[in-house]
Amino acid sequence: MNAKGSPCWWQMGENYFFATQSLANLEPTNIKYRIDNAFHMLRHFEGMDEQLQTNLLRAGHVEKNIQAELTLPGSRFFSNFALDIPGLLNRICLYPSVILETGDRNIQLNGQVSPADFPNGIGTKAVLHVDELSASQRAAIFLRKNRGLDLLHLQVDKVPPTWEFTLVLRPTQQGHVFITAFPGSPALPLPQHRLGRKRQEECKAFWDKHVFLVEAG
């Protein structure tokens, strides 16, 4: 339940009346996710508990790959905000979200946590548009392999905090399926062939203008 007394508090996006209807009584415990989603989310959490690690190993994920996910450059929720998917959903469902258009079968929910609740932020904002950078910062951008692709990166002293969050769900006849979540503004998927040519070009154009921040040292 949120501060308004309803299971989740969503605001309607322009073209998503149907999604608002389907989300009206959404409870965090009703959102389905698999162990592979938990593995993917290691790149958006600061760590994990022993039970999750045990579950990942039992599911066939090897220690080397688990550690690699935990060290990938990217935006991460602080450990005092959430360390797993259930905890994250319980947190963000307390705050209003706007439903955004994604161009695919998913729905994207973007919201803001009150700074009064988490004065130091809920996580890091490790992806910025190049227009948010100074001229000297833009000159220091470099390419690095990240998530299997050559993507733009910039070394900084400290990645800034954020109070913003993005949650991506897929509506199905059986309910909503968790796709991903991360601190910060909505983003397009990384360009992949499975997306189709037009969507892949849209995603490439997005990531050609966005930079991953990595801390020095």
Language-model features, listed with the residues they occupy:
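Functional cores of ribonucleases/endoribonucleases
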Residues: 2, 7-11, 15-18, 23-24, ...
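Glycine-rich loop/hinge motif
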Residues: 41
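An extracellular/secretory-lumen and virion-surface interaction module
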Residues: 44
